[in-house]
Amino acid sequence: RIPGGSSSGAAVSVATGAAFVGLGSDTGGSIRIPAALNGIVGFKNTARLVPTTGAIPLSTTLDTACAMTRSVRDAIVVHEVLAARRVTRSPAPLRLWRLAVPSTTFLDELDAPVARAFHRTLDTLRRAGAHIEEIALPLTAELGPMQANGSVSAAESHAWHRPLLAKRASQYDPRVRSRI
């Protein structure tokens, strides 16, 4: 069993009770994946909702400063502190909600327990009155091939780090440097 990747130390600290909260940045899963592998809550908030001042970016459009906690309630409290605003519930009843669920690509390779949990959640939302509509998004099948030679985050990372690499390439970890 592995504890995850990027923020796995923070995830283990929270999961074992050594820390109340683990802070980090999340671009493509650095908070959510270790949280999932350690059985805790990882919450990626809306981009630019929490200031990232002082953080070295991987992706200027996708990076978020966020947290891992042991419960959803704790995640809400920490998020409210980080974002300096209260989390409010939507005043609209669920019967007025219309949610689209992609029926292609995104759900294709889910592990069976994850797929069951996802569909149970959809059923719960339906019973609560939400209108759930499955929609095909055939163009998403092209995402993998489109990103074979890099993604938005790779391009943004290269643009941000290029001036530093020109001056201080030897100070970068070689593995990080090659990825940029």
Predicted regions mapped to residue ranges:
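Amidase signature
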Residues: 81-180
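Short glycine/serine-rich loop segments
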Residues: 1-79
